[in-house]
């Protein structure tokens, strides 16, 4: 009997010890600092502002810099992280801040094309002023004659990261790609061979400096010039599928705005005459409706990041402006004075 009582006492002690252990390790609202009782805040980044309308964040984006500002406008969190590390950690960036309401800001970059393509926070200390989280193309002259590393932006106001209990809370910050590749192809319809040196290409704009909210900051104009220019033979845009001589120029430009008026200009270097001078935005938007999606002009410009233009010239390098091709769509021009 004494042996049985001893076993029961031992069992009761073990049971009590287990109950106390569970109580100590449980997450109580009154013991926020206990080990194992955590409130974890995380941010997931999304890049579906593209023409495929799907999230491809982990593919083109390589590094992310996240800033978090509290309701007083103070910078309380700042971290730069490789996207490969974010993906390895489950696809999230962890925030080491208290649960509250924050404004989240992101500058992100893709695969490096040109080292130090941008200068960030050029207008002053952003510790107490999110408006100073600007981004400017790194340049010493008006002309940009090199490729630019892809630039992305994210900005979410009044993000609710409050938590009433322990656990994990995740919010999403969508990104917009700012940089665009513009490829200009000039084909000769007469059979005359074209040389890359026959033409001078440029795009004049004033979008080299962007504010914290991705809007343009008043700045000197900027001229984008080709980082690649070459000649060769291409398939003619006709039913005969013949090969014709062509010159190709590739330029990378910063964010395009529906309210601005950049100009794409091409000159004949043999005589200095202008081949054409067209409004880039107006021409880019000519094919927006062909994608069968409801988009504002600005949304289309933000989703589309690859613009391919094909122009035709005669044997004197004069522009044959009856029609052009934009992103493989044939466009019959009614007004070449746009």
Residue ranges of each PLM-predicted region?
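Bacterial N-terminal signal peptides that target proteins for export
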Residues: 2-16
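C-terminal motif of bacterial Sec signal peptides marking the signal peptidase cleavage site
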Residues: 23-26
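Bacterial signal peptide processing site
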Residues: 28-32
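A short, Gly/Thr-enriched small/hydrophobic beta-strand-prone motif that recurs across taxa
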Residues: 33-51, 174-187
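Tryptophan-paired
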Residues: 64-118, 195-291
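Short, low-hydrophobicity acidic/polar segments
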Residues: 77-177
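A sequence/structural signal for flexible, mid-protein segments enriched
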Residues: 142-241
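Hydrophilic extracytoplasmic domains
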Residues: 253-338
């Amino acid at each position: 009997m004494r042996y049985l009582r001893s076993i029961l006492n031992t069992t009761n002690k073990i049971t009590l010890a287990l109950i106390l252990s569970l109580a100590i390790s449980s997450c109580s609202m009154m013991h926020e600092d206990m080990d194992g009782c955590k409130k974890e805040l995380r941010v997931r980044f999304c890049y579906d502002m593209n023409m495929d309308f799907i999230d491809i964040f982990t593919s083109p984006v390589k590094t992310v810099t996240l800033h978090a500002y509290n309701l007083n406008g103070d910078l309380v969190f700042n971290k730069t992280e490789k996207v490969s590390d974010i993906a390895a950690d489950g696809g999230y960036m962890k925030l080491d801040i208290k649960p509250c309401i924050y404004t989240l800001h992101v500058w992100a970059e893709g695969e490096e094309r040109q080292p130090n393509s941008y200068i960030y926070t050029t207008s002053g200390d952003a510790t107490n002023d999110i408006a100073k989280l600007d981004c400017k193309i790194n340049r010493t002259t008006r002309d940009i004659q090199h490729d630019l590393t892809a630039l992305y932006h994210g900005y979410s106001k009044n993000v609710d990261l409050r938590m009433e209990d322990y656990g994990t809370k995740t919010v999403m910050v969508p990104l917009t790609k700012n940089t665009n590749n513009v490829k200009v192809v000039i084909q000769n319809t007469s059979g005359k061979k074209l040389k890359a040196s026959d033409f001078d290409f440029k795009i004049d704009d004033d979008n080299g400096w962007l504010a914290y909210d991705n809007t343009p900051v008043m700045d000197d104009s900027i001229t984008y010039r080709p980082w690649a220019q070459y000649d060769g033979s291409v398939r003619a845009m006709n039913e005969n599928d013949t090969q014709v001589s062509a010159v190709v120029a590739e330029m990378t430009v910063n964010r395009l705005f529906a309210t601005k008026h950049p100009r794409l200009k091409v000159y004949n270097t043999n005589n200095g005459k202008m081949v054409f001078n067209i409004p880039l935005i107006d021409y880019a938007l000519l094919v927006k409706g062909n994608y069968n999606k409801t988009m504002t002009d600005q949304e289309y410009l933000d989703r589309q990041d690859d613009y391919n233009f094909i122009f035709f010239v005669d044997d004197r390098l004069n522009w044959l402006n009856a029609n052009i091709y934009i992103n493989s769509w044939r466009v019959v021009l009614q007004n070449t004075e746009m």
